[in-house]
Amino acid sequence: VREQTYSNWEMIIIDDCSTDHTVELVKREQKKDSRIKLIQLEKNSGAAVARNTGMKHAKGKFIAFLDSDDQWLPNKLEEQIRFMEENNYTFTFSSFAIMDQYGNLTGKTNRAVKKADYYDILKRPGTIGCLTVILDREKITDPYMPNIKTRNDFATWLKILRNGHTAYGLDKVLAYYRL
């Protein structure tokens, strides 16, 4: 994230009771960059609680998600936010490439469709990758994820689309998803 060509970002890291050295690493990075914030959850609560906690603490206009094992390309925020602003879009996603567990690209890519509504993603649930989404929270007022074990992001996209929004795809690989 720190390598983004778009510099007006804040990174809210939610530590969901990790057992590695995440907290120490983040605290070191915070000393180098004031845009990094750390929130430690008291108990392991899962992805939905972590994402919702991050959204509650976010101050910016745009919300994006990145899990610890995935990666954004350095131009992701700049290109996708420009795409949103030039077209007045409130919900966007991009194409992404697949990495194996070691971080090697597999040659597989999930291509973004031009646009998707509620019925489109019901037919193709894997259309929108969470790591590629950017939401305009000034126009999408309830982006919070239901506290369910799996597919909480998919349930959220359905809710947003059911409320009349359309998701627009940018067919450029801007992220890497780790299997």
Explain the meaning of each model-derived region.
Residues 1-8:
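Short, acidic, metal-binding catalytic loop of nucleotide-sugar glycosyltransferases
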Residues 15-24, 43, 67:
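A conserved acidic beta->alpha catalytic loop
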Residues 20-28, 71, 75:
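Acidic helix N-cap motif at the loop->helix transition within catalytic regions
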Residues 41-58, 79:
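Glycine-rich, basic loop-to-helix element that forms the pyrophosphate-binding segment
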Residues 56, 94, 112-179:
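Conserved nucleotide-sugar donor-binding catalytic segment
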Residues 63:
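Short aromatic/hydrophobic "clamp" motif used to bind/position activated sugar donors
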Residues 67-71, 95:
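The conserved acidic donor/metal-binding loop of glycosyltransferases
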Residues 75-106:
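Conserved donor NDP-sugar-binding/catalytic core segment of glycosyltransferases
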